[in-house]
């Protein structure tokens, strides 16, 4: 039996972020839709060929998306929210963008669909909306067209399709409450039609993604799997594909399904492959996800080979990435500035394809002729363990010296709140922003010139100070109560801090997609983390010197830095988080000593870091909360600690949110129509809350009346004296014109509400 390999998906964005640039140029009216479509065709063709040349046997098709693959599935099924539908009922590319962004180059603006995290990753998907009685039909043939493209180019094609149960699981009911699982019988005919079309094209295998099978699903959802897959069997072979965790707890359901293969994630999951082999039907393909699709580290192919070798010859095996390579940068060979030793520790998406090819070749040659090549490839991993770049004795000793008091504020919240009220004397409904202001071409150019050495340090600081002054002046003109310095010096909220902490390295082109056209370049944590000098104090102190109003110091929290970086694999996530917390603890102390009395520690990734299995939640939450408190607890009683979170379902982690003991929490709520506040109301959350009153991911400017209505809904749930007024998130990606208009309306809404309670 010959072992073959495949990937579950490949990055869409292009090595130079070509897709992002084409999307944004199209949205700005700078290129035509035809030019955008051509960019997509070029990227797909390039990526298929690159995988083939790297040695991938089955090329995934259908992993490309114009915004998000879940949204693509919604269009495939004809699931378009009524507010986004074209008058004639047709679906086009602008329909897709209107759902995701709230507007498109054609069509009237309408509230964007909700966006949330894809399982426990930093990728976001557009949440499907379901209404009772809605109809589904094959309406968007992108998958079929792309399969035709790939076939015409001579590739061995494996279409990728998000499975029906996971699709329904990921969505939300809008309007009248009903069980969205009841829609299964309505969407299955569309899936049948798609599979029939693929069969007509001679497709043998379809990768049907059901990552919901790694979750602890309710019984009725598990029961739906046999129903769904009985309906889908027979037209093509189905590779039931799971990832992000193990599937042992759902194995009885899985092995009863009429599919022809199963893919398991052996990186994030802990499934015993010998047990899987014994449990699964002998005729099934067992696809082993042994190459990590979510990191940048070179694989220990010697160890992987030893793991898989005992199964060779006993059943048909495929070797694959643990999940889609969407979460990995594209090509390490493009990194010309990385230190050679550090570079030898890494593998990006294309290198992971090459790892699959080498591992497959070794498994197909049982005489051991590839063993030396495997060992040579894996040698840098062993060398890394002893590297001085990795180990810092001072950090180890400081971590060991932590005591319980280091994580506790001096006074409880109620006493602190009174002290802070006396210091700041803020009005009811105090207004603020989340941190960043628009990153103009001028600002980005300045940072690039400084990085390239075209601008010296003195000139750079002078220019950044001018941008800070502009941000302060804009906020004072608008009438905001608590100001920010605007973060002109920051490229990314995680990358910026990583650049100033020991233990991190950075890539030139290590971009990954976060959502739509939003790409991030995560730092890589390669060793013990420490802070050699103050990071933000200079800018915050200057901003505060320009105004009598309080200016917030802005930090990214330890859990978010961990979650939004590529972490080490040789120590626990808890250890890394606490190392970062100790480094940022020193920053909090330096800020307050410099006169900064309000300090925001952003933790948007706190919930994202949760394990997918609920039984593992509490252990994670305990150390995540401890890391935040270790970061913040050095603050004096009159120093007000804010935190910010977004895209969260808070209800099931409210005790941990409260345990953070932040004086103020600001959250993303506008897309959910303030529903997220229900969790805080039901829990009787004791501290102050700033519910986001407008969606910064959409260019739409909210009206005063819209914001006022949302704030009144908030006041129905939270006492007015504990409410703040702010946007959902930072304003980095917005333009100044819409930012001024939106913030002016926000301030005006707050003033109206103050008048109404006099």
Swiss-Prot record:
EC number: 2.1.1.14
Pathway recorded for this protein: Amino-acid biosynthesis; L-methionine biosynthesis via de novo pathway; L-methionine from L-homocysteine (MetE route): step 1/1
Binding site for Zn(2+): 644, 646, 668, 729
Single Gene Ontology MF annotation: 5-methyltetrahydropteroyltriglutamate-homocysteine S-methyltransferase activity
Single GO biological process annotation from the record: methionine biosynthetic process
Cofactor remark from the record: Binds 1 zinc ion per subunit.
Annotated binding of L-methionine, by residue: 434-436, 487, 602
Pfam families per record: Meth_synt_1, Meth_synt_2
Keywords carried by this UniProt record: Amino-acid biosynthesis, Metal-binding, Methionine biosynthesis, Methyltransferase, Repeat, Transferase, Zinc
Catalytic activity entry: 5-methyltetrahydropteroyltri-L-glutamate + L-homocysteine = tetrahydropteroyltri-L-glutamate + L-methionine
Binding site for 5-methyltetrahydropteroyltri-L-glutamate: 17-20, 117, 518-519, 564, 608
Cofactor dependency: Zn(2+)
Active site residues per record: 697 (proton donor)
Binding-site list for L-homocysteine: 434-436, 487, 602
Superkingdom as given in the UniProt entry: Bacteria
Function: Catalyzes the transfer of a methyl group from 5-methyltetrahydrofolate to homocysteine resulting in methionine formation.
Family: Belongs to the vitamin-B12 independent methionine synthase family.
Protein name: 5-methyltetrahydropteroyltriglutamate--homocysteine methyltransferase
Gene label: metE
